[in-house]
């Protein structure tokens, strides 16, 4: 079966999702929207996909290659339908996922968020190394969660993630691969993008945080956070140990603890709530 898969260039109602990468490469439960779509098509028996894309095509090509990961053949074209030797059974526009055809993706930031919430259980079952640690709480075996951290379902904690002591993740929260949620932080109703540091005693609500960018899911307000102690981008690491932890330790050394008594009082330290500035 042949498929033409059209990739939207951007979204007038959710423009921030295409700031860092092409829209179809927006983070989505451990992979990208495009990768999840290809997984579904391969499961249907599709053997040949022609991707019609015009925005940062090389980035898309670097992610999906020639389709080897799905056992399908992938080609690229700016106008796939003009190929004489390609007779598609279907033409699909990637404005919703095949796994959830009733849910639009790009109509608003809330649509993108809602699609992920709806698919957490199904995609967790498909991903190697994910386990259900408690009802609705899905955690990668390659992540580390402090014993006194609180995970409240529904939530997703991806691979190579660190969740620090007394941190709270959930409900309604997704932590993407390679992120670091420092001690005492609280992330509720939000998405934390890949390789993102959320500082100690920082509070995120109803937001999408990726690197130092903070987006409110309802208002669409976008802010770049200058204080890397609160929110920042981490370099991609091969695993949880090593450079990721070293970078966070370096940040902590900038504010040394004065005494054991001071350290003990930090348990009740007030949180810093991060909110995008209105009007951006």
Q: What residue spans do the PLM features occupy?
A:
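Residue-level signal for well-ordered alpha-helical positions
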Residues: 63, 118-119, 193
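Extended, small-residue-rich solenoid/repeat segments and analogous flexible loops
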Residues: 96-173
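Short, well-ordered coil/turn residues that connect adjacent beta-strands
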Residues: 30, 135, 141-142, 147, ...
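N-terminal glycine-rich phosphate-binding loop and ensuing alpha1 helix
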Residues: 1-60, 72
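Glycine-rich hexapeptide-repeat left-handed beta-helix
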Residues: 180-280
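Conserved beta-loop-beta/alpha segment of the NTase-like Rossmann-fold superfamily
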Residues: 44, 58-104
